[in-house]
């Protein structure tokens, strides 16, 4: 007897439904939500941990998996190689160039996001002009560790983002055993966002410990919850929608550190309306990017 992928998915769906899982929470290969109608945009992705010797080859791998899951477009950031603390301008430029190469090769499947190290403020502003103001990128981030995002060193970068209406994706975590030096938490994001109420800041991973992260950012309306990069546990998406409203929740995967399937499942399997799922899976990110995409004449 030959058992194919479709048979396995149907059997899994039937088993889950029999155990009380709602039918609309189970995605099968025939699920219309995976046919592109949800217009899924992944707001948090990287080229690391993937097969391929060039950015173009690695992006081709992602595109094959995107097609299987009905993912229309990625917002692609640094991470081609293992993360380097205190990255130099040369290292940052190399990472940004790799992203732009991947996007240039697949312009209908990805947009680029700018990697920066706030330790070098002058270079950050120069790189913003090179890659966003005068280049193809449309977002800032994922800004990672080394400098807390609540630091004044971020202020000039955020002001540049505001000047072109580009959102910022800021890495955050709340670790039980303490964060790395310079690694931001959602508290730092809130402090930064309050100083810059016209900025749109995506709280990367929502701090990992999302039950706390959601509550921390709740009152700060220009901060958005990022679903990326944690286990696909039940309740994350539902709590974010309940506490923030679906308009402030954004789907991302953190691929290649996580799979598309496990992260999309957080949304498709959530007990929320299809309308809310459409906002989270792409509508909200397109709304945030609309000004810069329109200014650059890019598709949304």
Model-inferred region functions:
Residues 31, 135-139, 147, 151-250, ...:
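Catalytic pocket-lining loop regions of alpha/beta-barrel enzymes
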Residues 57-62, 94-99, 124-126, 187-189, ...:
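Alpha-helical scaffolding within the catalytic cores
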Residues 40-50, 169-172:
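Histidine-centered catalytic micro-motifs
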Residues 2-39, 43, 55-73, 245-248, ...:
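Mid-to-C-terminal alpha-helical segments outside catalytic/metal-binding sites
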Residues 46-57, 83-88:
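Acidic/histidine-rich helix-loop elements
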């Amino acid at each position: 007897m030959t058992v194919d992928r479709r048979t396995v998915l149907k059997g899994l769906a039937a088993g889950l439904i029999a155990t009380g899982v709602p039918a609309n929470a189970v995605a099968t290969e025939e699920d219309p939500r995976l046919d592109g109608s949800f217009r899924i945009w992944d707001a948090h992705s990287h080229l690391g941990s993937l097969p391929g010797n060039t950015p173009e080859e690695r992006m081709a791998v992602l595109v094959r998996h995107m097609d299987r899951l009905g993912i229309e477009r990625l917002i692609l950031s640094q991470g081609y190689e293992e993360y380097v603390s205190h990255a130099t301008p040369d290292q940052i430029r190399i990472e940004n160039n790799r992203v732009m190469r991947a996007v240039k090769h697949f312009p209908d499947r990805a947009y680029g996001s700018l990697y920066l190290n706030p330790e070098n403020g002058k270079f950050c502003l120069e790189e913003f002009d090179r890659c966003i103001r005068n280049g193809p990128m449309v977002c800032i981030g994922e800004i990672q560790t080394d400098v807390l995002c609540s630091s004044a060193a971020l202020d000039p970068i955020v002001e540049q983002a505001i000047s072109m209406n580009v959102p910022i994706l800021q890495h955050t975590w709340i670790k039980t055993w303490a964060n790395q030096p310079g690694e931001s938490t959602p508290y730092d994001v809130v402090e930064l966002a309050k100083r810059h109420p016209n900025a749109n800041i995506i709280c990367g991973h929502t701090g990992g410990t999302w039950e706390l992260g959601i509550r921390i950012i709740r009152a700060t309306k220009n901060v958005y919850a990022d679903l990326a990069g944690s286990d696909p546990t039940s309740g994350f998406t539902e709590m974010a929608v309940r506490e923030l409203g679906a308009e402030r929740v954004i789907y991302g995967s953190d691929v290649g550190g996580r799979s598309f399937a496990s992260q999309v499942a957080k949304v498709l399997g959530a007990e929320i309306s299809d309308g809310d799922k459409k906002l989270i899976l792409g509508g909200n990110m397109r709304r945030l990017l609309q000004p810069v995409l329109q200014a650059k004449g890019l598709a949304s």
